[in-house]
């Protein structure tokens, strides 16, 4: 296990890595964890929750979200949801809008205080695709997408 400068503990056990995993796979996961703990994105944040579930009802549909990691700003002023990606296939970042709305509702905070990003740990140094304020889908937009799809 390692303790980063930001106080976030990352270790193979916490990542759910079984003891039976081979050395090559363990090395790859260690690289991913090292990438994660050195991300500039996480500066000024501390890990609050991992593999946490939230639900949000939009229209007649209840969506269940499992968030890989949620970090809180050190000063308590905001949140950062991270969805770790171990592959390189890019996922549309606007899908994180559901996570932002679900987390904000569960904490009783405005969506403007919640950031969200996909972090692709298989790239050297990591690749971050963050949902921007302009890219955040409204509840109405999500509801419209649910009724179309």
Please place each PLM-identified region on the residue numbering.
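Short acidic (Asp/Glu) and glycine-rich catalytic loops that position anionic groups and cofactors
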Residues: 6-15, 78-80, 119-127
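Non-catalytic protein-protein interaction segments used by genome-maintenance enzymes to assemble
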Residues: 53-98, 104-106
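Generic alpha-helical hydrophobic packing signal
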Residues: 1-3, 63, 79, 115-117
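Alpha-helical scaffold elements adjacent to nucleotide-binding pockets in ATP/GTP-utilizing enzyme cores
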Residues: 2, 95-99, 141, 145
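A non-catalytic, helix-rich entry segment at domain boundaries
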Residues: 1-56
């Amino acid at each position: 296990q390692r303790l980063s400068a930001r106080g976030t503990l990352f270790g193979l056990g916490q990542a759910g890595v079984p003891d039976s995993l081979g050395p090559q796979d363990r090395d790859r996961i260690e690289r991913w964890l090292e990438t994660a703990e050195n991300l500039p994105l996480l500066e000024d944040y501390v890990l609050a929750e991992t593999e946490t579930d939230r639900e949000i009802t939009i229209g007649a549909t209840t969506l269940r979200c499992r968030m890989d990691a949620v970090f809180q700003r050190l000063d308590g002023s905001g949140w950062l949801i991270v969805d770790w990606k171990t592959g390189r296939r890019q996922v549309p970042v606007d899908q994180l809008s559901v996570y932002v709305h679900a987390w904000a509702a569960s904490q009783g905070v405005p969506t403007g205080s919640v950031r969200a990003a996909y972090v692709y740990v298989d790239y050297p140094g990591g690749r971050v695709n963050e949902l921007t304020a302009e890219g955040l889908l409204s509840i109405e937009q999500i509801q419209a997408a649910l009724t179309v799809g």
